[in-house]
Amino acid sequence: MARATFDMNAAGLEARGGGHTEHGPLPFSVESLLEAERVPGSESGELGVERPLGASKPGAWPPPVAHSCPPRAPSPPPCTLRKHKTNRKPRTPFTTAQLLALERKFHQKQYLSIAERAEFSSSLSLTETQVKIWFQNRRAKAKRLQEAELEKLKLAAKPLLPAAFALPFPLGTQLHSSAATFGGNAVPGILAGPVAAYGMYYLS
């Protein structure tokens, strides 16, 4: 009785399944995992090819290109021009009264002795070094002015005509020699008048 019931159940299952039974792979079986890892192919039906991990996906941005910086131009050599000294002492600002006293003293005497310089600097509330340097600069200025005046005198003393047009001897000597050569006759040109007058004065 039990065997007949089992046969009927088996026959019913076969009738429902079309005469045979198929069982699909379980969701956690090895076949299902392998099917999930496969990559679908392209539209032409080709199977997908597995790409390495570092490969870029289709349609992604290309990797940035590293731009090499241009070489820097060499720095110019340091300037070798002579620079003014920064530790130079500032010029002494003399007052108007001090300058007038220094000028009067310079016109009296251009060179001061040590005692005179000490006394004079003390009267002006200046140091001996300041008075000494002022007299040195004033003497140099006086020398430049004197040389400029001499140059002006030399330029003023030069003749207006060049040396080629200067007469080698006085005009009277030339006229006397011309009259003696031609026997008192008049010479054509500019010598006619003076020679004739000279001859008439000599004959009278």
Swiss-Prot record:
Q: What's an example Gene Ontology biological process for this entry? A: regulation of transcription by RNA polymerase II
The record's listing under Pfam families reads: Homeodomain (PF00046)
The protein's matches in SMART domains, at most eight in alphabetical order, are given as:
HOX
Q: Read off the SUPFAM superfamilies from this record.
A: Homeodomain-like
Cell location:
Nucleus
Q: Which UniProt keywords apply?
A: Developmental protein, DNA-binding, Homeobox, Nucleus, Repressor, Transcription, Transcription regulation
Compositional bias of kind Pro residues = 60-79
Q: Which residues bind DNA?
A: 87-146
Q: From the UniProt entry, list the residue stretches annotated as the region Disordered.
A: 39-89
Q: In which tissues is it expressed?
A: Restricted to the dorsal embryonic central nervous system.
Q: Which CDD domains match?
A: homeodomain
InterPro entries from the UniProt entry = HD (IPR001356), HD_metazoa (IPR020479), Homeobox_CS (IPR017970), Homeodomain-like_sf (IPR009057), HTH_motif (IPR000047), Msh_Homeobox_Regulators (IPR050674)
Q: Name one GO molecular function term.
A: DNA-binding transcription factor activity, RNA polymerase II-specific
Q: A Gene Ontology CC term for this entry?
A: nucleus
Which purpose does this protein serve, as stated in its record?
Answer: Acts as a potent transcriptional repressor of MSX1.
Query: How does this chain assemble?
Result: Part of a complex composed of MSX3, CREBBP/CBP AND EP300/p300; the interaction with MSX3 decreases histone acetylation activity. Interacts with HDAC1. Interacts with CREBBP/CBP, TBP and SP1.
Which family does the record assign?
Answer: Belongs to the Msh homeobox family.
> Under which name does UniProt file this protein?
Homeobox protein MSX-3
Specify the species: Mus musculus (Mouse)
